[in-house]
Regions:
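Bacterial N-terminal signal peptides that target proteins for export
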Residues: 1-8
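C-terminal motif of bacterial Sec signal peptides marking the signal peptidase cleavage site
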Residues: 16-19
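Terminal domain-start segments
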Residues: 21-110, 218-229
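Acidic/hydrophobic-patterned starts of short beta strands in beta-sheet-rich repeat architectures
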Residues: 73-76, 118-129, 178-183
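Structural motif
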Residues: 84-86, 134-142, 192-199, 203
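Beta-propeller blade repeat segments, especially FG-GAP/WD-type strand-to-loop junctions
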Residues: 86-96, 137-157, 209-211
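Mid-length scaffold segments of soluble, non-membrane domains
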Residues: 114-151
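Short aromatic loop motif centered on NTY/YTY
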Residues: 150-211, 222-229
Length: 229
């Protein structure tokens, strides 16, 4: 009888221990769940990588000018920097062809002018250039309109081709149009003059536009040597 009571007490004790363990495990699970609920949630949305468009490099012009004459126009510009540049002349208004002309020049464009230099009622476009370096030698790039149809290149003779003109010539030219004539001026250097200081005065050349065998050309018409001031 005593053994039966002892067995009953053992069973009751085991049941009590099992209940406590279940309660402890349940509390532990509840605590863990509550801890997870209290953790800060990552609300940051995943961002897709953005692709930036590469910057488009704008065309840069070292010279740009538009000239107009009685319904015909010329867009003149140079691209690039440094001594070698690309000269572009884009005509507009001709009936047959308005194809652009591209030329490589040594130096820079100082100015561009339009005028009727042969009194035919149609324009000539003249681009004045200056070479790089201490001499700054000048040149004229010119085109003459063939009526309303198109335009053709005009020949401009270098000073070195004319014995009288080249005496004392060391560059530093300037160009202009006066009374429908092309004018070129440059300082005259005497023997021994440094490039930075001429003492021989100024030579002024007036050109006229004439018809040549293959194309129109400029011819020196008047030459005047002006004394130093």
């Amino acid at each position: 009888m005593k053994t039966s009571k002892t067995s009953i007490y053992l069973i009751i004790a085991l049941m009590a221990m099992t209940g406590c363990n279940d309660q402890t495990e349940t509390q532990s699970q509840n605590t863990e769940t509550h801890s997870q609920d209290n953790k800060p949630k990552d609300t940051t949305k995943s961002k897709e990588p953005t692709i930036e468009n590469p910057a488009v490099e704008k065309e840069t012009y070292s010279f740009q000018k538009t000239l107009q004459f009685k319904g015909i126009s010329f867009d003149v510009n140079t691209k690039g920097i440094g001594s070698l540049r690309q000269l572009v002349i884009q005509p507009k208004g001709f009936e047959e062809t308005n194809k652009s002309v591209e030329l490589e020049i040594d130096g820079k464009v100082t100015d561009a002018q339009v005028a009727d230099l042969n009194s035919d009622g149609f324009p000539e476009v003249l681009i004045f250039t200056q070479s790089a370096g201490s001499g700054s030698y000048g040149n004229v790039i010119a085109f003459s309109a063939n009526g309303v149809k198109s335009m053709s290149r005009v020949y401009f003779p270098p000073v070195s081709e004319n014995t009288k003109l080249k005496k004392g010539y060391m560059g530093h030219d300037s160009f202009s149009i006066k009374e429908s004539a092309l004018i070129q001026e440059f300082p005259i250097y005497k023997e021994g003059d440094p490039n930075s200081n001429s003492t021989g005065g100024t030579r002024r050349i007036q050109y006229k536009l004439v018809n040549g065998e293959a194309s129109r050309k400029f011819v020196a018409d008047k030459i005047i040597d002006l004394p130093s001031k």
